[in-house]
């Protein structure tokens, strides 16, 4: 299978940059003081006591828009790694990736607005009213925002299956660095910690809220390194 190694390496680097920018946005939500009363995405003490800075969701919005643009290059690299003979698989990845790029930034921003409204409403109307208003906002808009999740699933499963079935340029050992593998790890670790301990830590939020984007950074960077080490094989 012939590939343009230099172009794919560039696409992987740009994809890693995009995912890293998305992580920055995730961290703007999760790197705050944790409290035992925290629950879910937005009922957090730091939002309600006024210590959360409102420039953070703005940063999330900006890095999300730019990040999804660069992320698209990483998705292109994922598609280009698949054998051209596997047209259906490539089509699934292509259209799933296109839909994710279109919806991912909106979902990212929506999650960010939860912190903004909880902070503003708590200051204006008090905690109980703020929780009630944001609960209503979340229940109304989350079903629509969830449109992004099936496309994310297509990308994750498509990438994993393509390597398992040996339909890409990547060896099966690269499953160790696949986005699905690492996302599961980053989600399960805080879940296991919360089963063992009742205390929710900031690190639990960091790992769970940015799991998908951290996993993407790991995957894109590891594939770049693997491609660099095996570059001569594709030049022959």
Stretches found by the model and what they are:
Residues 1-236:
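Hydrophobic, aromatic-enriched alpha-helical segments typical of multi-pass transmembrane helices
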């Amino acid at each position: 299978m012939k590939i343009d190694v230099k172009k794919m390496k560039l696409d992987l680097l740009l994809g890693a940059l995009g995912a890293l920018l998305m992580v920055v946005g995730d961290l703007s939500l999760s790197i705050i003081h944790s409290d035992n009363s925290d629950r879910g995405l937005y009922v957090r003490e730091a939002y309600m006591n006024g210590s959360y800075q409102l420039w953070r969701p703005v940063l999330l919005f900006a890095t999300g828009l730019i990040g999804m643009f660069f992320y698209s290059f990483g998705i292109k690299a994922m598609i280009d790694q698949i054998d051209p003979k596997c047209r259906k698989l490539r089509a699934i990845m292509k259209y799933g990736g296109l839909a994710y790029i279109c919806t991912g930034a909106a979902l990212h921003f929506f999650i960010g607005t939860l912190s903004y409204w909880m902070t503003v409403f708590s200051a204006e109307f008090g905690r109980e009213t703020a929780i009630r208003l944001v609960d209503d906002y979340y229940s109304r808009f989350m079903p629509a925002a969830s449109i992004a999740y099936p496309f994310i699933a297509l990308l994750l499963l498509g990438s994993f299956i393509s390597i398992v079935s040996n339909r890409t340029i990547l060896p099966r050992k690269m499953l160790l660095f696949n986005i699905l593998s690492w996302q599961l790890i980053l989600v399960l670790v805080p879940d296991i910690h919360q089963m063992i301990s009742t205390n929710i830590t900031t690190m639990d939020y960091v790992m769970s809220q940015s799991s998908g984007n951290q996993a993407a950074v790991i995957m894109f960077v590891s594939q770049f390194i693997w491609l660099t080490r095996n570059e001569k094989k594709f030049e022959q």
